Amino acid sequence: MAAVSMSVALRQALWGRRVATVAAVSVSKVSTRSLSTSTWRLAQDQTRDTQLITVDEKLDITTITGVPEEHIKTRKARIFVPARNNMQSGVNNTKKWKMEFDTRERWENPLMGWASTADPLSNLVLTFSTKEDAVAFAEKNGWSYDVEERKVPKPKSKSYGANFSWNKRTRVSTK
């Protein structure tokens, strides 16, 4: 009910502004654009965005994507979580699931010597927050897919004193 009463209050405030704008235009005889109308439409669009439409049945959208059929039917997608960068200790890049496609034929461009391909999906990498979202997207587009499960590293229990032990390789003299 709060959204409805807010809308009514906004309508009354904007209607008052519109009447004042119309009166000002009629007095000055200069055509100016009424801003209150666009503000009212903006307020209505914001209320429409909050109402989501959910479709329970699975839709096949392969015919309307614009991708040639040979790239849809024979396409294999790989769904995975990227590995941590070995040069850094952070794991921020390993939170999202990624989908990439198999490599198709490439050739060397005779003019510039660059690697060329006729595959529109070759350099496409999609990012998803969950594995289920990635699988649903692949099924919706009609692609076959392989899922590589996330590899969770086992924490190694070490003591700080192990860094200074004399019988380990860490304390071998370099002289």
From Swiss-Prot:
* Localization terms from the record: Mitochondrion inner membrane
Q: How is it modified after translation?
A: Phosphorylated.
One example GO MF annotation: NADH dehydrogenase (ubiquinone) activity
Q: How does it sit in the membrane?
A: Peripheral membrane protein
A biological process (GO) of this protein is: mitochondrial respiratory chain complex I assembly
* Modified sites of kind Phosphoserine: S173
Q: Give the domain of life.
A: Eukaryota
Q: Does the keyword Electron transport apply?
A: yes
Q: Which InterPro entries does this chain map to? A: NADH_UbQ_FeS_4_mit-like, NDUFS4-like_sf
UniProt cross-references to Pfam families, sorted A to Z: NDUS4 (PF04800)
Chaperone in keyword set: no
Give the GO cellular component terms, alphabetically.
mitochondrial inner membrane; mitochondrion; respiratory chain complex I
Q: Give the residue range annotated as the organelle targeting sequence.
A: 1-42
Keywords (alphabetical) are: Electron transport, Membrane, Mitochondrion, Mitochondrion inner membrane, Phosphoprotein, Respiratory chain, Transit peptide, Transport
Identify the stretch(es) annotated as Disordered.
Answer: 149-175
User: Which family would the database say this protein is a member of?
Assistant: Belongs to the complex I NDUFS4 subunit family.
Q: What does this protein do?
A: Accessory subunit of the mitochondrial membrane respiratory chain NADH dehydrogenase (Complex I), that is believed not to be involved in catalysis. Complex I functions in the transfer of electrons from NADH to the respiratory chain. The immediate electron acceptor for the enzyme is believed to be ubiquinone.
Which PANTHER family does the entry link to? NADH DEHYDROGENASE [UBIQUINONE] IRON-SULFUR PROTEIN 4, MITOCHONDRIAL, NADH-UBIQUINONE OXIDOREDUCTASE
Query: Partners and quaternary state?
Result: Mammalian complex I is composed of 45 different subunits. This is a component of the iron-sulfur (IP) fragment of the enzyme. Interacts with BCAP31 and TOMM40; the interaction mediates its translocation to the mitochondria; the interaction with BCAP31 is direct.
Protein name as annotated: NADH dehydrogenase [ubiquinone] iron-sulfur protein 4, mitochondrial
Its taxonomic placement starts with: Eukaryota, Metazoa, Chordata, Craniata, Vertebrata
